[in-house]
Amino acid sequence: MTDVDVYRKRLERIEELLLELSESAERGAVIIVEGKRDILSMKKLGIKGSFELATRYSLFNFSERVASLGCEVIILTDWDRRGDLLAAKLSEYFENFGVKPDLQIRNKLKLISQKEIKDIESLYTYVSKLRVKTGSSLNSEYETNLEFER
């Protein structure tokens, strides 16, 4: 398998996860990130929806407020030490409030990126680089989403 094939497979897997994330967001899921740059990266990737910054309030109060919304919760914190701790703590709080948060997308992105990136804000740049390396362009789903964002 050539490097291009490896990059192509990685790009396909990331785009599948982004599509899954986009569909969840359209159904009303709340996406929890750490910072404003994370939101910007997600929007550049065509993800529209409700984003919440986990770092603006106490985690207990934040989790209680988001849990009271009664919607699906997707935790998309960075995969550095701080992000791992934050994801674990948020998950614990949400479960105490009766909400089972989705950590699968975060965990799969962490695995796929193979330590080439460690945060959500770098995801757009990483995907762009993979597209250049593989000769791919934005797929029509993301082009459509980006057109609405402009």
Swiss-Prot record:
Mg(2+) 2 binds at residues 78, 80. CDD domains: TOPRIM_RNase_M5_like. InterPro entries: TOPRIM_dom, TOPRIM_RNase_M5-like, UPF0292. SUPFAM superfamilies: Toprim domain (SSF110455). GO terms for molecular function: metal ion binding. The keyword Metal-binding applies. Pfam families: Toprim. Keywords: Magnesium, Metal-binding. Residues 28-109 form the Toprim domain. Binds two Mg(2+) per subunit. Its cofactor is Mg(2+). Mg(2+) 1 binds at residues 34, 78. Disulfide bonds: none annotated. Belongs to the UPF0292 family. This is UPF0292 protein MM_0821. It comes from Methanosarcina mazei (strain ATCC BAA-159 / DSM 3647 / Goe1 / Go1 / JCM 11833 / OCM 88).
